[in-house]
Structures are given as C-alpha cells and as structure tokens.
Amino acid sequence: MTHWIAGEWVAGTGEKLESHTPYSHELLWQGYSASGEQVDAAVKAARRAFLDWKKRPFAEREQKVLAFAELVKANSEQIAQVIAKETGKPLWETRTEAASIAGKIAISIRAYHERTGETVREAAGNQLVLRHRPLGVMAVFGPYNFPGHLPNGHIVPALLAGNTVVFKPSEQTPWTGEVLMQLWQQAGLPAGVINLVQGSKETGIALAQSRGIDGLLFTGSANTGHLLHRQFAGQPDKMLALEMGGNNPMVISEHYGDLDATVYTIIQSAFISSGQRCTCVRRLYVPQGTKGDALLDKLVSVTAKLRIDQPFAEPAPFMGPLVSEAAAQAILKAQADLQALGGKSLLEARALHAAFITPAIIDVTAIERLPDDEYFGPLLQVVRYQTLAQAVELANDTRFGLSAGLVSTDDGEWDYFVEHIRAGIVNRNRQLTGASGDAPFGGPGASGNLRPSAFYAADYCAYPMASMEGDTTLLPATLSPGVEL
C-alpha cells in the first residue's frame, strides 16, 4: 500500500512509481502514484479532520508529536538505513539526520510558545489579547536530499499549531516517506490529521492546485519553486513558503590562517552529501598569489583522495553516489559546459559505476559571464580575485542568496564582508553546510520567500488574531461629535 488517506493505507491508481538504490540499482520500493482523485480525497480528509483537531488542547496535540519523537528515537537505525539506501548518503551521515528528526521537535514546541502562543496585557482600561489560529490544511512538499529531517521541520510545527497536513515526499524517496508515515500512524493521530500522497510531477500539480489547501510549505529546487510561485499568483488567501537552493559563494582571504583547517572547511562545505545540500559552496573565491596557489594545490590533492563508496562500506566513505544517474550526468554536463566556456579543470569529474562520480574543481576565472546556476552535486567553481571588494562584488553577482562565507582571521575583513554580502546565512571560518535549528533558514532572491523551518516555521503555520476586550460596553463621558443618546 502506497498512500495514507483518511486513516487508511490505500493503493495508488496513477502511474507506476519505483525507488532503487543509486549505487546498485536494487529495487527498494514500488507502488502507484496518487491520482488526482486520490489527492482530492486526501485534502478532503484533512479538511474534515481539521474541524476537530484545531479544537483539541495544545497539550493533546503536543502529546501526539512527542509520541512520534519517541518512535523516531526507537527506530532511528531503521530510518537511517532506509535513507542511506534511497539517497546513497553514507550511513554515518543518515544517522545524524535520523537523530535530527527527533531533535528538531523540541525546538518546534518551544517556538510554538514563544512565537505563536497567547499573550495578554492591559492598556487604557482594555484587555489586549494576542491569539494565534491555525491556517487549515497545509500541503508539505519534501526534498530528496534530507527526506526525513526537512519535511518534518514543516509537518511538526503545522500539527502543533492545529493544522492538518497532506504530505508529498520526493518521488526519489517514497520509502522514507512511507516509513515516517507509519510512525505517525503509531503515534495515534486521528484519521485525516496527516495524509500521505506519493507521486511525481502530476501528483504535485494536483496537490498544489487543490482549492482545499490553505497553505503550502515547499523545500526543493528553484525551478519547481518558481513554478509554484507563478501558480499561486493572484491567490492571497493561500500561504506559500518556498525554501530553495543557491549558487553559494565562499571567499577565502589571504589571511586564511591554518592551511589544513581551511582546506577541510572548504571540503566540508563543497562536497559533503556529494554536494547535494542547498547550502553547499558552489563558487570559491581565492586570492591571486602564492598563498592562493598553495591553498588550491592542497585542496585539489586532498579532494582527489576523498573516499567514495556505497553507504554501508567499511571503512566509511566521505561521499556516496548522487541520488540518480540523471543527477550524475547533469554534473558531468555542467562540467563540460564550463570547460567549453573557457573553464580550466583543476580536478576533472569522472563517471564511475551507477550514480557515482568523482568530485570536480574547475577554475572559471577566465569565463566572462559565469552561468548563474545551482549545480547540485560535487562541482566546485574557483575564481581568482585581486581585492576583497572585488571578491564580494563577484560573490553578490547572483539571483540567489541562500548562504555565503568568509574564511579570514582579520576582523576588519569580516566587518566589511558581513556588511556588504547579500545572503540569508553568512558564516565566518565555518562550513556553510551547518545551520542551527534555532536560526532562520533561507535567503533572499531566488533562494526563497520566507523562513519556514524549525524555530521560525511557527510563524507560517498560524495567523495572529488581535483582540481588544472588556467585560461590558463602555459609555464615554464625551460622545463623538454628531451622536446623541
């Protein structure tokens, strides 16, 4: 059974859907996509359940979420193995993701109270009350790179606020979505409070176009997110929150400090998860001169020796395959395109078996108009620069704005960088691929429109209701002009 609708597991009636390991082609999961009628049934089930769920005390909603958290902890190894098999990420990495699913729940509960709870104050003889009310039925679209951690960063705040949910995982990771839905089922959520619909483009279109949803929380590619943005134009009654990618720059100062620490920071920023994190560094700005040369020599040498293997290999690999052979071919094509434009490969990516490729480092300094694209994989573009001001100007030359970083021991350089850079996540001497669940996640421009993750997700799962209240009506000593009683 493929879909969880109105408290029942049902088979899909749409096109066939399969999930294979990206490292061995082993069949992991198969089923049939949700048809438009089944998506509609899921939305209607969520609408019916909303009427009761929103009225339940917060403590009861919280108890269901905490029960889910305990189930995640008890099944964390199974979750980690499923994610590793579907995505190809090393097991050590997916174990971290499984732990983060439960860990983020505590943040979401605290955020509910601090950002969307209820406050009361007195002013001029009036009682001023701020309450928050759920939006209604929320559609949640999950990505493939963090198929457990990221969608639950939307699902949990939505449920805590009193919304009901229709969840569509990535078509690349349906098994992970099903495993997590089984845990929500075991947590005892009432029928229809959360629903699962599996499928690819047609299923997603049907869900996004449904008149029955009140909001949509999306994590994924800029291309899909921009289509959703156009689709939602003219519908101010629906909340749309988009988390998308970036063409993220990291500037290496001449004052970068320890060589090995800097190289390690770059590798962690560019090649972790095989470059399949939205915050990964895509453009590396390196100073002209001997210090920049030494850095690049060491970076290329270390990157060429990175261990690449399947998720369960011993010794453990740093990188696994990409999520699919199509994704791997896209990176190889991007490399060829950049070479054709005048880029010089310092380390050329090579196709291995299945969806494995080796990482690429390419000097694109000579390219006059560098394509402003997010290459979602292990491809790092290097640009040599003369001054920090020039590097920052080049770094800002993008329609995206998700993350950016500076590696420098000079406080003055950091002050200049943080004042002039345009990005939502800006790190100093730290990898770009780490983010705090307590902090806003997202960026301006083509990287998204809101910050609907973790602590700040609460803001987009409920609307504020402001009230001025009194026990009785009041008759003022002086009436408004033109009124006689």
Curated annotation (Swiss-Prot):
SUPFAM superfamilies registered for this protein in UniProt: ALDH-like
Binding positions for NAD(+) per the UniProt entry: G220, S221, A222, N223, T224, G225
Keyword GTP-binding assigned: no
PROSITE patterns: ALDEHYDE_DEHYDR_CYS (PS00070), ALDEHYDE_DEHYDR_GLU (PS00687)
Reactions performed catalytically: N-succinyl-L-glutamate 5-semialdehyde + NAD(+) + H2O = N-succinyl-L-glutamate + NADH + 2 H(+)
Alphabetical list of Gene3D superfamilies matching this protein: Aldehyde Dehydrogenase, Chain A, domain 1, Aldehyde Dehydrogenase, Chain A, domain 2
Annotated pathway: Amino-acid degradation; L-arginine degradation via AST pathway; L-glutamate and succinate from L-arginine: step 4/5
Keywords: Arginine metabolism, NAD, Oxidoreductase
GO biological process: arginine catabolic process to glutamate; arginine catabolic process to succinate
EC numbers on record: 1.2.1.71
Residues at the catalytic site: E243, C278
Sample GO molecular function, one term: succinylglutamate-semialdehyde dehydrogenase activity
Domain of life: Bacteria
Pfam families (UniProt xref): Aldedh
Signal peptide (UniProt feature, chain positions): none
Protein task: Catalyzes the NAD-dependent reduction of succinylglutamate semialdehyde into succinylglutamate.
Entry similarity comment: Belongs to the aldehyde dehydrogenase family. AstD subfamily.
Protein name per the record: N-succinylglutamate 5-semialdehyde dehydrogenase
Species this protein is from: Vibrio cholerae serotype O1 (strain ATCC 39315 / El Tor Inaba N16961)
